[in-house]
Each structure stands twice: as C-alpha cells, then as structure tokens.
Amino acid sequence: MKKTLITVATIAVIALATSCKNEMFLAKKLEKLPTKVITPAELRKNYNINTVAVEKLYPSGLESFGDTIPQAYLDEWTRFIMDMGKALKEADMKWEKDYRLWLRGHYSADGSVEYFFYNFLGQDMPSPEWEAQFQEVMKEYIKTFRFNYPINRKFSQCGSARLQATK
C-alpha cells in the first residue's frame, strides 16, 4: 500500500513537471511569433500551436468571478470592442458589407494585450487585402490598449462583434 502511494505521488509530480515544461515551451513559441494578431487557423497551420493549449496560459477572465460578473469588467470588454471600431475608422478603413467577427484578447496581468486572435464568421468574408490591412490596424491598436480591470494574472476574454458596413 505504501509503495503504491509513493508511486502515485511520483507520477503526479512527473505529470506536474511535464505540464510546467510544456507551458514554458508554449510560452517560448508564442514569444517567437512574428505577429501578435493572428487567426487560430494560421496559428495551427504555420506555427503548430493549438489555441486550447494557449488558453491554459491565459485562462478566461470570467473564471475570476463567482456567479456575478462585475459590470466594470463587462464595460472594459465593451470598451475594447468599441475602441477597436474607432481604430478601424481612424485608419480610414472602408467595407461594403457587414462582417461578423469572433475575437479573443490575451492580456498580461497589468491588462496590456499580449495577443489578439480573431476569425471572420459567416458567408461574407473580407478580401485578403482588406484583412491584411485589418491586421495592421489591430497590431497598432493592441500596442496601446489596456484592460483596466484588475485580474492580477494573465487572462483572456473572447466574444463576437459585428463590423457594420461603412457605406
């Protein structure tokens, strides 16, 4: 019985050490990415990084709360999306159709954006040229945005948005 407990404890320690090693390896892979604005498909295809693994490094900010999510937290997420729209407008980006967008911000403990994952949804997709311009605007936008709600650990927040046509 005692030997079994020691073996189980040893396996648990090895599993924990392996998990930490994998997280460190993933963190180093993320640091080497040439961009902080990317789609999950590009992340998998070009860099062999699975977004599920990334979420272990950046657990949802919502996990910090019990049954009640503070309105101030939700307001910050809304501000992220609204300010993103302002950044696109200030960059004089134009588009003729509405685009639906899934997005996930990955934030440091101080609220600065470390990575921005996105995916366009639905049948109407932007042209590759427009999407490239979108990525450039987002790269600049995330340099200055700060999520002003104290979580005090790395976290992520996802949601969807609709980019209305600029007719």
Q: Which residue ranges define each predicted feature?
A:
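Charge-biased low-complexity segments
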Residues: 21-167
